[in-house]
Design a protein with these regions (language model features):
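Conserved catalytic-core segment of nucleotide-activated headgroup transferases in glycan assembly
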Residues: 1, 109-195
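N-terminal pre-catalytic "stem/leader" segment of glycosyltransferase-like enzymes
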Residues: 1-29
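Membrane-proximal helix-turn-helix segments that form the acceptor-binding/catalytic region
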Residues: 35, 51, 65-85
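Active-site proximal beta-strand in glycosyltransferases
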Residues: 37-57
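Donor nucleotide-sugar binding/catalytic pocket of nucleotide-sugar-dependent glycosyltransferases
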Residues: 82-117
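Nucleotide-sugar-dependent
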Residues: 139, 187-224, 230-239
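Conserved acidic donor-binding segment of nucleotide-sugar-dependent glycosyltransferases
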Residues: 241-254, 262-269
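A charged, aromatic-enriched C-terminal amphipathic alpha-helix characteristic of glycosyltransferases
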Residues: 251-252, 266-292
Length: 292
């Protein structure tokens, strides 16, 4: 439920078995939940990033840090009053917030609705690779610039797709065969990534305290659009990707990424095999999930 666009008095059920609050909620909702606490059943706070430490994550845009920190700060006391338990999405978050006795709730892949899905028999576009990051991944977007430039020079048939605003378009404008797509909402992106097809997806993750607490959800995105993935050999991917089987782990050295991308683009059959194993892992291997 999108609490930003709904009135709790009109949209909340008569009785709920459990209420999950993800990251933060508007004060109006938190105050209403406090008054109507008897209708809520169990109330769980789900932390899927290190939101309390976001202000110190200098790799994130300042505006994003300030907005996220303020939303968390103003509702913190009410959340502490309301919530029975805390769920976290990664072992690193569980370690950092051990004083809250959190329960580990690792993300797992949920297939998109059938009406959104492309055909699994549909082949990915050969020599097509992509990075689907947001403004919160600006350092990775900048880090990939020389990598993409070298790959495009080495593979004249290669096409690269990235998401971003005018800043990203300006950054990549001199590199041939690069498509910069405008940012999307999550429902829009889910629909898009369920129908588009690429041969290779990139998931660089620079080694910072904030990134080390992230989860491995890029694996699900990359697999959804039919691609094999290249992932940073660091948290959160180092413990999740089986190198050479469900993806490739690569050190955060740009020349290593150039070599790995070029090699993978020139071997579409191997990319297909890696994607198939990753898809099987996404659908059949699930991490920890607390009992309700």
């Amino acid at each position: 439920m999108d609490t930003r666009r709904s009135d709790p008095g009109r949209t909340f059920p008569v009785q709920a078995a459990a209420v999950f609050i993800v990251r933060y909620a508007p004060l109006a909702w938190l105050r209403w939940l406090r008054v109507e606490r008897a209708r809520c059943g169990r109330v769980v706070y789900l932390l899927d990033d290190d939101i309390p430490a976001v202000l110190h994550a200098s790799e994130l845009p300042l505006g994003y840090r300030l907005r996220t920190w303020w939303r968390h700060l103003r509702g913190r006391k009410l959340l502490a009053e309301l919530c029975d338990s805390v769920w976290v999405s990664t072992p690193e978050l569980a370690r950092r917030y051990a004083d809250s006795c959190p329960e580990l709730c690792e993300p797992y892949d949920v297939p998109a609705p059938v009406k959104m899905q492309g055909s699994e028999a549909e082949l990915p576009a050969q020599a097509s690779y992509c990075y689907h990051g947001t403004r919160a991944h600006r350092r990775e977007i900048e880090w990939l610039l020389p990598v993409v430039r070298e790959v495009q020079a080495a593979c004249p048939e290669a096409r690269f797709e990235i998401f971003g605003d005018w800043r990203v378009r300006r950054l990549y404008r001199d590199i041939p065969r690069v498509s910069v797509r405008a940012p999307m909402t999550w429902p829009e992106y889910l629909a898009y990534s369920s129908t588009v097809r690429h041969q290779l997806g990139l998931a660089p993750c620079l080694d910072t305290p904030f990134n080390r607490a992230r989860s491995h959800v890029k694996l699900f995105d990359i697999t959804r659009f039919g691609a094999a993935g290249i992932y940073s050999d660091a948290e959160p991917y180092a413990r999740r990707i089986r190198n050479g089987e469900t993806g490739w782990l690569c050190p955060n050295r740009q020349q290593d990424w150039v070599w790995m991308i070029v090699r993978a683009l020139r071997d579409p059959q191997e990319c297909g095999a890696v994607h198939a194993r990753a898809l099987h892992a996404c659908r059949h291997e699930r991490g920890a999930f607390p009992a309700l």
